[in-house]
Swiss-Prot record:
Gene: apt
Top-level taxon: Bacteria
Assembly and interaction partners: Homodimer.
Principal EC category: transferase
Localisation per UniProt entry: Cytoplasm
Functional note: Catalyzes a salvage reaction resulting in the formation of AMP, that is energically less costly than de novo synthesis.
One biological process term in Gene Ontology: purine ribonucleoside salvage
EC number: 2.4.2.7
Sorted UniProt keywords: Cytoplasm, Glycosyltransferase, Purine salvage, Transferase
Catalysed conversion reaction: AMP + diphosphate = 5-phospho-alpha-D-ribose 1-diphosphate + adenine
SUPFAM superfamilies named among the record's database cross-references: PRTase-like
Name recorded for this polypeptide: Adenine phosphoribosyltransferase
A Pfam family of this chain: Pribosyltran
Length: 178
């Protein structure tokens, strides 16, 4: 099963970025051509039927999966960045992380009203990053109903939080209770 192979490639780093966190290092997928290409293929298979207008990938690991997915789907890619990284006029949204707080920005002209946008990131934990991303896209008039991830940590409740704001999530693999 392709998802099982991808999960087997993901390395776990204990106590990173702080004590008590088991960090799932999705960059280990990038080192394995088969795992990386299979990840993109699985995301394409899942999301191609929805006919999205754009993929929004969150900094920075969301870029690594979101941009190739957008290319395969034949649509545009929106980089969702941390503050002061985008050159044109932006809108901003603050959010809570599993291990702190942060802010995200997108160009104010990145989404046209009515465009269907797929949000994509490497990992779903508490959902804070994706909620902030959804808020940014919706403030610009975009439609956000789906989010994709390589990894989900269901014990942290992110999927339920996304459902509360009308976003369905799909992950390639899950790490429960680990």
């Amino acid at each position: 099963m392709p998802a099982a192979y991808i999960k087997s490639v993901i390395k776990t780093v204990p106590d990173y970025p702080k004590p008590g966190i088991l960090f799932r290092d999705v960059t280990s997928i990038l080192e394995d051509h088969k795992a990386y290409t299979t990840s993109i293929e699985l995301l394409v298979k899942e999301f191609a039927p929805y006919n999205f207008d754009k993929v929004a990938g969150t900094e920075a690991r969301g870029f690594l999966f979101g941009a190739p997915l957008a290319i395969e789907l034949g649509i545009g890619f929106i980089p969702v960045r941390k503050p002061n990284k985008l050159p044109r006029k932006v809108i901003s949204e603050s959010y809570d992380l599993e291990y702190g707080t942060d802010c995200l920005e997108i160009h104010e002209d990145a989404v046209k009203p009515g465009e269907k946008v797929l949000m994509l990131d490497d990992l779903l934990a508490t959902g804070g990053t994706m909620i902030a991303t959804a808020n940014l896209i919706r403030r610009l008039g975009g439609i956000v109903e789906h989010a994709g991830f390589v990894i989900s940590l269901p014990d942290l409740g992110g999927e339920a939080k996304l459902q509360e704001i009308g976003v369905q999530s799909h992950s390639i693999c899950e790490f429960e209770g680990e």
